[in-house]
Structures are given as structure tokens and as C-alpha cells.
Amino acid sequence: MKLSRRSFMKANAVAAAAAAAGLSVPGVARAVVGQQEAIKWDKAPCRFCGTGCGVLVGTQQGRVVACQGDPDAPVNRGLNCIKGYFLPKIMYGKDRLTQPMLRMKDGSYHKDGEFTPVSWEQAFDVMEEKFKTSLKEKGPEAIGMFGSGQWTIWEGYAAAKLFKAGFRSNNIDPNARHCMASAVVGFMRTFGMDEPMGCYDDIEQADAFVLWGSNMAEMHPILWSRITNRRLSDPNVKVAVLSTFQHRSFELADNGIVFTPQSDLVILNYIANYIIQNNAVNQDFFTKHVNLRKGATDIGYGLRPTHPLEKAAKNPGSDASEPMSFDEYKAFVAEYTLDKTAEMTGVPKDQLEQLAQLYADPNKRVISYWTMGFNQHTRGVWANNLVYNLHLLTGKISQPGCGPFSLTGQPSACGTAREVGTFSHRLPADMVVTNEKHRDICEKHWQIPAGTIPAKVGLHAVAQDRALKDGKLNVYWVMCNNNMQAGPNINEDRMPGWRDPRNFIIVSDPYPTVSALSADLILPTAMWVEKEGAYGNAERRTQFWRQQIKAPGEAKSDLWQLVQFSRRFKTEEVWPEALLAQKPELRGKTLYDVLFATPAVSKFPLSELKEDQLNDESRELGFYLQKGLFEEYAWFGRGHGHDLAPFDDYHNARGLRWPVVEGKETQWRYSEGNDPYVKAGEGYKFYGKPDGKAVIFALPFEPAAESPDNEYDLWLSTGRVLEHWHTGSMTRRVPELHRAFPEAVVFIHPLDAKARDLRRGDKVKVSSRRGEVISIVETRGRNRPPQGLVYMPFFDAAQLVNNLTLDATDPLSKETDFKKCAVKLAKV
């Protein structure tokens, strides 16, 4: 058979990805022509990271049997990474949960009982009793939910609506708190609106790429393949990679920079100083479109108020800032000289200058990419603000080929966690619970009494752990995440809180994860194409998919669980009399009636679904639930810069990037000719701010919450590897991926290993002030730490690396710093 050049390149890309992981390409990925007639194909976004690759899913006899990259998908253009090629296998692990499991002893629930199969009716009976008891005895603040950037858009919307409007509790937060919260607050502080202004099309037009704490080669491999193609096709294109250790992205780097942990703040201020000292400020852009402010400092570390670091902080948690002049800002960054920066960071001067020159050169279009290195940082918001400073000083923003771009790690951290408003402080379309006008907009649109939504910010992820341990949060529903393994400092707060007899923990999951096995009730959940869904990726692209198969056994989607559970509560049981008096017609109605079976949500009939189209939730309820929820939600953003297209448009497209106005998506926000919200003659308008100007912040270096000392003498950084995604609850059930990287290891510099009498392959005990794990020494391989630092991935349930990590957070975003704590090693 003769191959076209395109087919040849695709086939080789697949083989290369597989070879890099030590794998053979699975038969299901080959989509053999002879089988295609027997296989039904439909589109879906990939289940894994926030890149948002499009895939074609092949189903046969009620199972997903094949998967291939969608050649019509603009994100990945027919390619998949190695995880994407094994998507069919994530749903068929041998230990897939198919019925609810409750801890029982002598025929009834018991905290120390054995997991026993029960019906959904029995499961909801116990949940109902626990919710109602806590609501009656302690009120809405005694219940909470921990959700996900892997929820579909309507699942997140339904969860936020149920908790914030139904139960009147803002104690709902997504696991995106652990990965994207600093990016959110950074965007809001600088631009007044969340999410990137650019898109992936920038890659083919950029002259330079700077990676700040992002190993795109392994974590966003499809985007990295596009960057690689751009770099190798033009010798003038440059790539700079900054990290606290060397990794696979360094292989392409023209300037690979390893810096001392936390000192990225110093480098960012040095570059701003370099730009000013070399007269590289875009004065016209700066004068018209930028304000300057000096931020509060010494803001603490998000630890408990009794912690010595919090007591010592002068301005704990302060988001305050004050105006400053350009001369004052110039003097502020002038302290970050080349000599000082080289000394504080450990980076050679010539490398620092080369990096600064990329930003300062007016003829270089620069994209800054970052992921967890910036965000999982006790000054993550500051790091985000400081990188925006570089683009605002030079005017390299909101135009093709240049701009700051925060990459997401989950498939709908943007579309669900951020845009829908599932954070404990947010409402849809960048609105917040503390703003009375925003609450009023939601209450009127949802047709619920004024004052229903609480004005108090709910508990964020780490605060939920602490409240569980303290007995203040007593009923906790965890959906679509594995936070017992993924969250920080397992031993001190989370595990004690989950196993406290005062508390009842529900986990909805397809598999018996560490979280599920630590709970009191496990609810079996439908996965991916076992339900109709929608995700929003890192470039503001909203993508839909249809239900293509049924879930096994009694497994139900998160949406089904939320909506059906809402039937258990009447308004009189959850709302005070003062609210009911405003709308007496709501008396006697259930939360299902008030929130999900309203005229606005239920107006789309089943006739809009094709006769043979699967949609378990809608067919059970008698109306097109997903469409009703989406259209109700989309109303919030239309006309306000968050415009989403009509529901049906997404099923006919490979995703659309908002704002979508008059059927046209937006590639670059805030610039004239690209963004429909920027009028002719305005040039640029950062319309999230009242005056249309973005903000440059003066923010200093401040040290990490914990650093190595004589006893705990090494930095620990945690993260991921190519073959596994997050806690491995899906990828470790794919035999090929598990074989490729079967267990976590400790990546360590050979000299550090030698000094501790350790050799490659030795068992080693890694200890911090909070706990310990036993791992395996690795002195070679893809990750090459400098002396003084070790790196461990967190996918391995047998090596709970978060026994070691500290629950210090960015005080502004409440996002955990998983990249910096102090450990010691001992040979086992």
C-alpha cells in the first residue's frame, strides 16, 4: 500500500511516541481498514490533559474497541500521545466498580465496617440521612464537596447549583484548586478576566518559546510536537526552558536553565529590569494600555493561623496593592541586577542575558508557557503576574505568535472548574459569591429567592481537609478525583479527617482508588463516552461529545447522581422561612423541581435526540437535560466577553473558542480586529478592567515555606511522567502503560546518591517532617536533578509521595506548593 507523506508522518509519530515509552502500538489504535465497516466511529475530546486533543472513538457491540487521532481536529491534527492511543483500555480495568459499596457491620452502616454492595436506593438513603442531620444540627457549613476539572461542563454546573443554591453551601471546590487556582487569580489581578488571550495557532507564528516550570515534552506532548516542528523548521526560532531540574524538554532547548527553587521570582524581575535598562519598553503600548501597582508583601504561606510562619507574616493573605509611578517601578526592579540574580538563582550570567534578550528584542514574537512550576508555588499568583509584566512592558501580547499562556493539566479545568464557577468563591462567567450584584444575577436567573446564595466564601481544598480533621465539616462528597493520593500532607489532616467517626465521606469513582478505599460510601461512576459530555481546554475551546456506550452494571454518571440526589430534599428542609416567604410557590417542591426540572432547563424535548442516540440521563427524566443545563449556564457569559455558541453548534464542530459572537470564534482576545469586544480605533482593550487597562505589579522575591537544612538536606519536587496521568487511576489499569513505568522512583543526582551510599535500583526511605515513603533510587533516565534536589512522580498508590509534602499554599489562590519541601534519604 502506498502511503502519502501525511500518513507516513503520522505513522512515524505514533511509532516514535510508542518507542519513547518502550511500547508497541496497540491494535486498537491502528484502526485497521478491514474493521472499520463493523465499527461505529464518533468524535470526542481526549479524556486526559488540558490540551484538548480530538479523537475518533470506535465502538462495537457496546464497547469502545478502537481509538485514533481525529485528522479534522485542529488541536492535534490526527496525532495522539501515547496515553491517547490507549484510551479504550482505561474503562476496562478488572476492578471496575459496578455497584454502590457501603461500609457495613451487622447489616447497617458502620464507620469501621467492610465495604458491602448496596442498591442506589440504600446508598442515597444513608447519604440523605447524613446530609439532613448535618444541615439540621450545624447548618450548610457542615457539608461540602470536592469536585474536578475532569467533570463535564454540565456536571460541574449542576454540582455548583445544587450546593450553592440548593444546600446554600459554598463549601464546594474542584481539584483544579491544586493546579490552576494561581493562574486564575493571576489573570484576574492583571486583566480582570480569566484564561489566556491567545491560542495554539500562536505556535506556528512564534519566534521564541519560553517554558517556565513546564515539561511540555511529557505533559503536553502534542503541543510539544508542534513546537518541535516550528523550532526545527526555522533556525532562527529559539527555545528556552527553565526548571529546577533537567527533563525531556531540555533536549530541544537552545537555552536550558536550571535554577534554585523559588528563585524564578528573581529571574522574572531581572528580565523586567533588563527590558527597562535597554530601552526595550514599548512606550506607546505601555502608556495607552497599562497601569502600575505595588503589591502587598510578606503575605504568609496559607498554613494554619497557629503556624509560626503565619504568626510571623506582616500581611497574611493580603491581596492589597497601591498605585505607583513608572520611576518607582523602575527603581523597584533595578535591585534585580545580573550579578544578584546569578548569585540567588545559580544560573550563569550569559544564560540569563540570552533569556532576557528574547523578551527585549522588538522583532521577536515570544510565547511564555507555564504549568505547575509556576502555579504550584507559594507565590504562584505573583509568578503569573510577573510573567505578564514582561509581555505588557514589551507589548508582546494579544497578537499572533506572542503572549503569555497558562497551560492546563486537566481536560476541563478551564471549561468546568473555572468558567462554570465550581471554586468555593466563584459563580459562572468570572462572577464571585462575595459580590452582591453577582449573587443577585444568579438568583434571578435561577428564579430562586434573593439571599439564597451565601455571601461567605466557602472552604477551599486544603481548608476542607483541616475542617474535616477539626470536626467542622461532617459530610463530604468527593467526585471525579483521587485527592487522598493527590492532595498534600496526607497524614496530618486529610486521613485523620476522613476516618473521623464524626464524618461521613462519599467518593464517586469508576475504580477503587486510594480515595475510594478511604471513604465510607463508594458510588460507581460512568466514564468518558459512557455519558454525553463537554470539556473546555486551555485555549478556550469548548468541545462536545455524545454518549457512545452504556456504563457497566449500575455505574451512573456524576450528573445522574447529582440530579437524582436532589430529589431527596424539599425546600423547607434546606431553606429558612425567610427565603420561602419570598417565593411561597416553591414550598413543598424538591431541589430537583427547583433547580433541574424548571421550565428553562426542561424545555428541550427528547425529540431533539436521534431515535438511536444514547443519553441515559435525559431519557430517564423525559427531557434533554444536558442541553437545558448548558443553555441556562451559557446565558451568564453571552454579551459579557464569555460568549458560548448555541448548544447544537458544538456537536457539529471540532470545538469553538470563546467568545463566540455571531457564529465566529475568537483566536486572540483584547486586540482590535481579533476580538469582537474591542472597537475600531481602540487598538487594545483589556475590558475585564473598568478602564480597559492591564496592570503591571511590583512584587519581590520571597522565600519558600520550607527549605533544606542540616537534617532534611534535600529539596523534593513532585510531578508527573509521560506514561501516567496524575494518580494513575486510569493509566495504571492499561497494561502497556503500567509495564512502561510500573512504579515510582526517586530521581537523584549521582553524586548525591554516592554521598549517601546509594546506587541505582537501591531501596531508599524518603522522609520529611510529615511522613515517609519507600522508593527506588534512579540516577539516570529522563529527569536529571541538580545536586541538592530529588524528584518523585505521584502516580504510584504504593508510594504516597504526598505523605511528604507540605500543605503550604499561595495565600491568594490557596493553591498548594507541591514543588518545594525538605526531605532526607536513608538506605533501606
Swiss-Prot record:
GO terms for biological process: cellular respiration; Mo-molybdopterin cofactor biosynthetic process; nitrate assimilation. This is Periplasmic nitrate reductase. Mo-bis(molybdopterin guanine dinucleotide) binds at residues 83, 150, 175, 179, 212-219, 243-247, 262-264, 372, 376, 482, 508-509, 531, 558, 718-727, 802, 819. CDD domains: MopB_CT_Nitrate-R-NapA-like (cd02791), MopB_Nitrate-R-NapA-like (cd02754). InterPro entries: Asp_de-COase-like_dom_sf, CT_Nitrate-R-NapA-like, MoPterin_dinucl-bd_dom, Mopterin_OxRdtase, Mopterin_OxRdtase_4Fe-4S_dom, MopterinOxRdtase_cofactor_BS, Periplasm_NO3_reductase_lsu, Prok_molybdopt-oxidoreductase. Residues 1-31 form the signal peptide. PROSITE patterns: 4FE4S_MOW_BIS_MGD, MOLYBDOPTERIN_PROK_1, TAT. Belongs to the prokaryotic molybdopterin-containing oxidoreductase family. NasA/NapA/NarB subfamily. Its cofactor is [4Fe-4S] cluster; Mo-bis(molybdopterin guanine dinucleotide). GO terms for cellular component: membrane; nitrate reductase complex; periplasmic space. Predicted to be exported by the Tat system. The position of the signal peptide cleavage has not been experimentally proven. Keywords: 4Fe-4S, Electron transport, Iron, Iron-sulfur, Metal-binding, Molybdenum, Nitrate assimilation, Oxidoreductase, Periplasm, Signal, Transport. Catalytic subunit of the periplasmic nitrate reductase complex NapAB. Receives electrons from NapB and catalyzes the reduction of nitrate to nitrite. Binds 1 [4Fe-4S] cluster. It comes from Salmonella typhimurium (strain LT2 / SGSC1412 / ATCC 700720). The gene is napA. Its main location: periplasm. Residues 39-95 form the 4Fe-4S Mo/W bis-MGD-type domain. It is an enzyme of class 1 (oxidoreductase). [4Fe-4S] cluster binds at residues 46, 49, 53, 81. Component of the periplasmic nitrate reductase NapAB complex composed of NapA and NapB. Substrate binds at residue 794. One of its GO terms (molecular function) is molybdopterin cofactor binding.
